Regions:
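C-terminal regulatory/interaction module of P-loop NTP-utilizing enzymes
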Residues: 1-163
Length: 163
């Protein structure tokens, strides 16, 4: 499985090595899910599919996101899965938060390159259509009122085109 090594690493990062006397008394220790449970929860939420899609789009745009995006998403899914139900966001709000805060910011790096390409070529770069397609896909998944759509609108306003 593509995401298994990342899930193992994310859980290793979150695992506490021990509680020291200097730690905050209010520190809450959560029972973290196992690798299979983490991947199952990420899949149930649709985030593994979103990650695969985002990695594909990043590749087409020439962006190198590295493993940090995947690790960030899997870490927050692990915490979400471990949290008591009284502290959990609803699934749709949580997914919108993850996409808008942990996935889409990686795509901001495309704006300067697209602006430079537009100036040098005096025409609209193909990346603009890819970003528009991203906005459409996110709108289908998360709805027109989602925070993720607003992030995409902001990214489109950074590009040298009519939105």
């Amino acid at each position: 499985d593509l995401f298994r090594p990342y899930a193992e690493r994310a859980l290793r990062y979150l695992a506490m090595r021990g509680v020291l006397e200097e730690d905050l008394a209010t520190l809450v220790v959560l029972g973290l899910p196992g690798v299979e449970e983490l991947l199952g929860e990420a899949d149930r939420l649709g985030l593994l599919g979103v990650l695969e899609w985002a990695l594909g789009v990043a590749d087409r745009l020439g962006l190198e996101v590295g493993p940090s995006m995947v690790l960030d998403v899997l870490r927050v899914v692990a915490v979400h899965a471990a949290a008591p139900s009284s502290l959990r966001l609803s699934d749709d709000v949580f997914v919108d938060y993850v996409v808008s805060s942990l996935i889409l910011p990686y795509f901001a790096a495309v704006a300067p390159r697209v602006r430079q390409k537009a100036v040098l070529s005096a025409r609209q770069p193909r990346e603009v259509n890819e970003v528009r397609d991203m906005r459409e896909k996110i709108g289908e998944w998360l709805g027109a009122q989602s925070l993720s759509i607003r992030v995409m609108e902001g990214l489109l306003h950074e590009l040298p085109v009519e939105v």
